[in-house]
Structure formats: structure tokens, C-alpha cells
């Protein structure tokens, strides 16, 4: 079977170019073979493919790539994977703009991406140890929230406050009761591809714990609030503006948390987010894994042209020749589909 691919999603952009490729390949194969497609199940299966290049991804990119609905915000929940589609407020345009720095999870900055996963696993283990529920197994943040009986991610923030900000691997090993560093690496930090999350691990290797989990749980709470705000829209103009004001606060707080607590932003992303706000975006945040790539923001429809022209000038001053490759206005689009010719 020979598949020929073509796409216009910039590589290293943080706009799910890798997920677009894997989702398209899988859907094409199933269509050609006349195999019935369950896109929810397919999203979970495709998400596992990134583990073959030693990146411990989640599954959100694949889920939305296959199941998005035009004009709707996709609220994605896991364990099990399920969707809730909610309409964006009227009069809003989505702006997407580049930091002019590539974000490549599988090369270079991959270390930071997998290290964040390791730091979260370590924090989860410490939370369970404190609660007397540690069983020497890998647990995700949602697992811990459920095991501790917290209905909302916000309920975890007080628990996180008791965690140390930083620990060396040796200190973590002693705290969790592993007999050796090797045992801990294999049991707590192994990857699906058979490797370990932390390259060149040594007893003195330091992990950041408190800030990472504070970001994860506060971000989960922001996502819940975003969903709630959209669900309670009444449709009148006063309510629309109030909704946008709440969205503005949530998205801006999200970028700040990504930058300060999770440290997945960078000076280039922070610069372009700040510039976008100067040019008319009322809210913006990085998208994708971070450490470069693109950011996404919202613009009032009546101000979209002015915003675009101002941002275009910014990129021209940066020496960008093909501005259409680094800046575009769009809307929530449809997920993957097949057309049989």
C-alpha cells in the first residue's frame, strides 16, 4: 500500500502536524481497506504511535484532529475518551501566529517534554505516598485526583501546596522507598517504547515538583471553567461580552501558568503573545507542547482586519517574507473526513 501525503500545517509549529499525519494515514488505510471507523477509538489508537519516537504524548491532538466539529469548541475528557461540543460566542475570530521558533518534540527540546511527564509522575507518587496510597505504580494526575476523592482539579491545589518545589532523584528514591535509582527509573519513569523519560539520569538530577502539578491542576480547573462559561451563554449582547471577558481572563492566566509554573513557554512565544495583544488580540496563549511553535488568540471580528495588518507589520520587521505562512485568521473547523474519488 502506497500513501502519498500533502499538507500545509507548518512543521514544528505546535499545531499538531505530527498528529495530522498519523491520523490521516490511519484513516486513509481504514477507508481503503473498507474497515468501519470509530473515530473515538481510532484517536486512542493513533495516540500510541508517538511513543515509537520516544515522546510520551497524551492524546488530545489526535482526539480533536479526528472528532472536531465546525464552529464548536471540543471539550475532551479521558478515561474513557469522550467529547462535549460547545459553540463559541458570536463575533469572534481565531488568530494563529508563529513565534518564529520551531517546536520539535521528537528532537532537541524533546528532553524538556519528557522531563515534564517525569516531574508529574514524581509529584503524583509523592501525593499518594503522603495519603498512604502509594503502590509503586505509575499514576497520572487525574488518577490521583480520583484516588483522593476530589471532584474538581481545584480541590487538589491544597494537596499540591504540601509538595517540595524541587527534589533530586536520590531524594525522591529515598522518599518513595526504592532500593536503587535503576529500580525507580524502570518502575516510575519508563516509556512505552522501552526507554526512560529522563536522559542521563544521575542521583543529583533535579526535578521540579510543586510548580508542575500546580500548573496541571490549575489548568484543569481553568478548562472546566471555560466549559462552564460557554455552557451558560444566554445569547444577548451583554452576556456575550461578559462571556468573552471571562474567556480573556482564563486564556491569559493559562499562558502565564504555562510560562511560570510549567516552564514550557520561551522568550519568543512570550514576545509574540505580548505583540498580539498590542495589535488587538484580547487573549492569547501558546499552543502545542510549547518551547516555540505557534500561539493562538481571539480577536473581535470587527477588529480582525486591523489586527492582521498590524501583526503583518511585526513579521515584516522580523524579516519574514511569506507572512501567510506564520499568521492566519481562522475558525473552529471540522475534524478528519474521507472523500472517495
Kindly label every feature range from the protein language model:
Residues 13-19, 261-263, 285:
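Short helix-coil transition sites and intra-membrane helix breaks within transmembrane domains
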Residues 1-5, 269, 284:
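A short glycine-rich, hydrophobically flanked beta-strand micro-motif that places a catalytic Asp/Glu
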Residues 1-90, 98-103, 116, 129-130, ...:
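Gly/Ser-rich oxyanion-binding loop with an adjacent helix/lid
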Residues 19-20, 294-298:
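FabD-like malonyl-/acyl-CoA
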Residues 75-283, 297-341:
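C-terminal nucleotide
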